[in-house]
């Protein structure tokens, strides 16, 4: 296990958390654009093409009817998934003006704000979506992810714990908790949570890939590569392994892995 005195760069983990709470599959059959979705930054060429086509179609729908609730939610989620957080914020600012007390709209707006780096504003918005008397697990998890991205990991984990009491078998909660531990270099705890997550309802390929990532960052490259290979084509597997080794090299952690392995 790596020394906890060596802190990893937070940027990659923030990106994964953001994707974990914000991204959706850009397809017409996506059932709910405000729930947890795919984690992953390198879609295959075929999938990327489908995403571009879906985004273009949603943009046309939005242009024709910018006040339609479903179109606002799906289009903004598609923009977030495509890395266009600023544009998603603009779309959702109009949405929350029209649908002021709509919890799904508020959650989507909070995600877009967080994706654009506006963490304090995102927290203010997500608080409007949380009913203190009956909080939803998804809203609590989203707030936790926003806090994690702002470096408030202890507060974030408290919210994940609350969310788990409401929905104990939700993979996305354990996955986000695992990434929270990864942000503070507690890779053993991160692995434990992600291993639980992959066995639960709602576990996605992205959750399994994040487990592979955490294992790889502990220097267990063969196991990491095997897990990636079950989810991705060979070229993406090797790209991910190169990324992991680059992270370790950049953070001077590979020497520690070899010393402590």
Language model segments and positions:
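Terminal, low-structured helical/coil segments at or just beyond the last alpha-helical repeat
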Residues: 34, 205, 211-261
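Helix-start (N-cap) detector for alpha-helical repeat units in TPR-like alpha-solenoids
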Residues: 69-70, 103-104, 135-138, 153, ...
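N-terminal leader/linker segments that initiate helical-solenoid repeat arrays
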Residues: 2, 22-82, 86, 90, ...
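Canonical tetratricopeptide repeat
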Residues: 74, 108, 141-142, 176, ...
């Amino acid at each position: 296990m790596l020394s906890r005195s060596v802190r990893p760069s937070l940027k990659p983990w923030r990106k994964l958390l953001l994707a974990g709470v914000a991204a959706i599959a850009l397809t017409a059959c996506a059932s709910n654009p405000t729930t947890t979705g795919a984690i992953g930054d390198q879609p295959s060429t075929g999938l990327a093409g489908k995403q571009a086509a879906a985004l273009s179609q949603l943009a046309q729908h939005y242009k024709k009817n910018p006040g339609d609730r479903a179109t606002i939610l799906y289009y903004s989620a598609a923009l977030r998934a495509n890395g266009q957080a600023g544009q998603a914020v603009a779309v959702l600012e109009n949405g929350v003006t029209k649908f002021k007390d709509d919890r799904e709209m508020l959650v989507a707006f909070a995600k877009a704000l967080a994706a654009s780096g506006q963490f304090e504003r995102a927290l203010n918005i997500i608080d409007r979506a949380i009913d203190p008397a009956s909080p939803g697990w998804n809203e609590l998890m989203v707030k936790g992810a926003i806090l994690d991205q702002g470096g408030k990991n202890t507060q974030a984990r408290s919210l994940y714990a609350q969310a788990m009491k409401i929905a104990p078998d939700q993979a996305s909660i354990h996955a986000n908790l695992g990434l929270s531990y990864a942000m503070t270099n507690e890779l053993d705890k991160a692995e434990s949570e992600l291993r639980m997550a992959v066995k639960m309802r709602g576990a996605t390929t992205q959750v399994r890939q994040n487990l592979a990532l955490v294992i790889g960052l502990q220097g267990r490259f063969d196991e990491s590569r095997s897990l990636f290979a079950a989810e991705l084509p060979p070229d993406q597997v090797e790209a991910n392994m190169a990324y992991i080794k680059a992270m370790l090299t950049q953070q001077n952690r590979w020497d520690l892995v070899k010393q402590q392995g």
